[in-house]
UniProtKB/Swiss-Prot annotation:
GO terms for biological process: gluconeogenesis; glyceraldehyde-3-phosphate biosynthetic process; glycerol catabolic process; glycolytic process. It comes from the Bacteria. The keyword Cytoplasm applies. InterPro entries: Aldolase_TIM, TIM_sf, TrioseP_Isoase_bac/euk, Triosephosphate_isomerase, Triosephosphate_isomerase_AS. The keyword Isomerase applies. It comes from Enterococcus faecalis (strain ATCC 700802 / V583). This is Triosephosphate isomerase.
């Protein structure tokens, strides 16, 4: 039985005071980690104070990105070793916004995944297709390619422990969402690709999220599906009440 994981991706939103107010509102209200993993994907600026705010709570922290080197002349980048030292559990990598706006490649994302594991954290590895790819019927082929290139060189144990988030680009922040059956089908493609590469035991262990205009009103439909183990949520994770409602719908 795979434990559900609900991760909020705040993207480039909130001030420090807003982030800390959110943390105070949710830290004693989230369900137990025995039931569901509750994760906040915060801007890097807030990770240190939030780690302090949330140190005795069930909420886990995710960075939204990191570099693949621990130190060096990489102005403006965030060291995975430094992120881990703050007590961060997860790092989101491969998000479509990083791929599109910052030209990150599958090879870049693969190096980041290895660095994240090397520093004792867990990647939330994002994959997803454009509307053009979806309408051309090439979603499965596209997703298989992203996963195959993005996970190369990782061990069975590492892949089994990671989180893979399927986010159709055409559903991110648009108000549109892939219906639950489509989400289940493509999350099934993710799982079958992992099985081809790493075997059935690993594919049955890896947790797969759906992301793309998920909100409290529709999350239960997705979570009822066999291949959907959680959600990577953008806008609906920005308000404490909404984030808690997402978790309540899952527990």
């Amino acid at each position: 039985m795979r434990k559900p994981i609900i991760a909020g991706n705040w993207k480039m939103n909130k001030t420090l005071s807003e982030a800390q107010s959110f943390a105070e509102a949710v830290k004693n209200a989230v369900p137990s980690n025995d039931v569901v993993d509750a994760v906040i994907g915060s801007p890097a600026l807030f990770l240190a104070p939030l780690a302090w705010n949330l140190k005795d709570s069930e909420v886990k922290l995710a960075a939204q990105n990191c570099y693949w080197e621990n130190a060096g002349a990489f102005t403006g980048e965030n060291s995975p070793a430094a992120i881990a030292d703050l007590g961060v559990d997860y790092v989101i990598i491969g998000h479509s916004e990083r791929r599109e706006y910052f030209h990150e490649t599958d090879e870049d994302i693969n190096k980041k995944a290895k660095a994240i594991f090397a520093n004792g954290m867990t990647p939330i590895f994002c994959c997803g297709e454009t509307l053009e790819t979806y309408e051309a019927g090439k979603t499965a082929e596209w997703i298989e390619g992203q996963i195959t290139k993005g996970l190369v060189g990782l061990s069975n144990e590492q892949v089994a422990s990671m989180v893979i988030a399927y986010e159709p680009i055409w559903a991110i922040g648009t108000g549109k969402s892939a219906d639950a059956n489509i989400a289940d089908e493509i999350c099934g493609v993710v799982r079958s690709t992992v099985e081809k590469l790493y075997g059935k035991e690993v594919s049955e262990a890896v947790r797969i999220q759906y992301g793309g205009s998920v909100k409290p009103e529709n999350i239960a439909e997705y979570m009822a599906k066999e291949n959907v183990d959680g959600a990577l949520v953008g806008g609906a994770s920005l308000e404490a009440d909404s984030f808690l409602a997402l978790l309540d719908a899952v527990k």
